[in-house]
């Protein structure tokens, strides 16, 4: 049996495609999460659909300090399957995933993309604190792994960004959609993909109003963290992530996506019916996100 570890709805979408590539193998799926809203619950069920067995693990969003560490320490008591042939995961630096793997055995390790972080220089998913306090925490929760130890075990990486250099050299491309797209296009629709880039609700609302005045999008697809709405903006309220929303409801439309630098844009960049228009924000702390655009062959549609 193989082990599939997921932390986000996008990872479930990718995981399902990977599982399709192994039709004669059984999978045990685990969905981690601190906020179990309708979207996460839906995608946990989507993971369970393609696995012979599965479980969900609540990572305790509201727990802090020692209570949080105790919850992680108790993870070993929830593990029901101990031995696996192959393990698949995206988040090498997750303490939860590292601790889970510390209490099971496996023969081979495979990874897959955690959004566009895999193709940018100095990705967060390879970062791990080296402090004494962090080492004490790992010892307390029973985590025997590190990013470096796991990275050295990677046999292959599955990527939805085959045209870009990945942090893992041995890659196998996968597609999130049916490559035989031949629907007749009937109209055009545009979206702005929400990203709360500022610290306060008021600042983010002001940014959306500014976008509305300067960018001609039809609909706004909110980020899960955006628990506010702006009058006059046409929001898409869906339990699906945007990629799935496109595949299920807009297969016969040309889609224009406006975005700052959302992973959604990179996930759909090569889709034949999708046009990506990157918007450069003037917010100082996010300028580094645009530094790699020339190397990635990306251009800015508009600056605001």
Swiss-Prot record:
CMP-N-acetyl-beta-neuraminate binds at residues 221-225, 242-243, 262-263. It comes from Haemophilus influenzae (strain ATCC 51907 / DSM 11121 / KW20 / Rd). Catalyzes the transfer of sialic acid from the substrate CMP-N-acetylneuraminate to the terminal galactose residue of the N-acetyllactosamine moiety of surface lipooligosaccharide (LOS). Thus, functions in the sialylation of LOS, which plays a role in the evasion of the host immune response. Its EC number is 2.4.3.6. Keywords: Glycosyltransferase, Lipopolysaccharide biosynthesis, Transferase. It comes from the Bacteria. Pathway: Bacterial outer membrane biogenesis; lipooligosaccharide biosynthesis. Disruption phenotype: Disruption of this gene results in persistence of sialylated glycoforms of lipooligosaccharide but a reduction in sialyl-N-acetyllactosamine-containing glycoforms. It catalyses: a beta-D-galactosyl-(1->4)-N-acetyl-beta-D-glucosaminyl derivative + CMP-N-acetyl-beta-neuraminate = an N-acetyl-alpha-neuraminyl-(2->3)-beta-D-galactosyl-(1->4)-N-acetyl-beta-D-glucosaminyl derivative + CMP + H(+). It holds the Pfam family Glyco_transf_52. Belongs to the glycosyltransferase 52 family. Gene3D superfamilies: 3.30.370.20. This is N-acetyllactosaminide alpha-2,3-sialyltransferase. GO terms for biological process: lipopolysaccharide biosynthetic process. The active site is at residue 223. GO terms for molecular function: N-acetyllactosaminide alpha-2,3-sialyltransferase activity.
